[in-house]
Amino acid sequence: MSGIAAGRLAEERKHWRKDHPFGFIAKPVKNADGTLNLFNWECAIPGRKDTIWEGGLYRIRMLFKDDFPSTPPKCKFEPPLFHPNVYPSGTVCLSLLDENKDWKPSISIKQLLIGIQDLLNHPNIEDPAQAEAYQIYCQNRAEYEKRVKKEAVKYAAELVQKQMLE
């Protein structure tokens, strides 16, 4: 099944290089020998304009298994984000990434990253993954927004882009 996964991921890369949303980054990691590891992608999602996430660029790793696209990739913020739907490990809790819920093999990397960006500003409080962020989001929205704005400054787009290019 690995051949199918590798072929699909090569296509995803080709489509991404031709057309991707402004400010987003998605690229396979390079192996020590300079070849690309299509099963391990470094990505970054910009905070949407006019939201508390604006100004930040949030790094995320996508790990694909041999049975992709039958199963979704594992998406993990590195470092983990303060968000109700991000586990303390950084793993994203999103129905699109759950093969038993909304995952479909036709979903592209671009669609996933846009979906995760949308989740940042619209948490799903029915499916919390991080107790502290969930409680603060529900009980003290002003404090939650203050914490998120600090993260946006901490992960300023210019700094993260520079780190990813090194």
From Swiss-Prot:
Q: Pathway listed for it?
A: Protein modification; protein sumoylation
**Which InterPro entries does its entry note?**
Ub_conjugating_enzyme, UBQ-conjugat_E2_core, UBQ-conjugating_AS, UBQ-conjugating_enzyme/RWD
Q: Does the keyword ATP-binding apply?
A: yes
Protein name, UniProt field:
SUMO-conjugating enzyme UBC9
**Name of the gene:** ubc-9
Q: A single Pfam family, by name?
A: UQ_con
> How does the annotation summarize its subunit structure?
Interacts with brd-1 and rad-51. Interacts with smo-1 and sop-2. Interacts with bet-1 (via BROMO domain 2). Interacts with isoforms 1 and 2 of X-box-binding protein xbp-1.
The active site is formed by: C93
Query: GO terms for molecular function, please?
Result: ATP binding; RNA polymerase II-specific DNA-binding transcription factor binding; SAM domain binding; SUMO conjugating enzyme activity
A biological process term (GO) from this entry: nematode pharyngeal muscle development
Superkingdom classification of source: Eukaryota
Gene3D superfamilies found in the cross-reference section: Ubiquitin Conjugating Enzyme (3.10.110.10)
Places the protein is found: Nucleus envelope
Cellular component, GO, one term = nuclear envelope
Q: What does this protein do?
A: Accepts the ubiquitin-like protein smo-1 from the aos-1-uba-2 E1 complex and catalyzes its covalent attachment to other proteins with the help of an E3 ligase such as gei-17. Required to sumoylate the ETS transcription factor lin-1, Polycomb protein sop-2, and intermediate filament proteins, such as ifb-1. Required for embryonic development, fertility, vulval morphogenesis, inhibition of vulval cell fates, lifespan, and neuromuscular activity.
Keyword list (alphabetical) reads:
ATP-binding, Developmental protein, Nucleotide-binding, Nucleus, Transferase, Ubl conjugation pathway
Instruction: Just give the chief location class.
Output: nucleus
Q: What happens when the gene is disrupted?
A: RNAi-mediated knockdown results in sterility, embryonic lethality and sensitivity to radiation. RNAi-mediated knockdown causes a number of defects during the first embryonic mitotic division including loss of smo-1 from metaphase chromosomes, chromosome misalignment at metaphase, diminished spindle pole separation, slow chromosome segregation, decreased distance between chromosomes afer anaphase onset and increased air-2 levels in the spindle midzone. RNAi-mediated knockdown results in ectopic tbx-2 expression in seam cells, the gut and in the syncytial hypodermis.
Species whose genome carries this gene: Caenorhabditis elegans
Q: What is its EC number?
A: 2.3.2.-
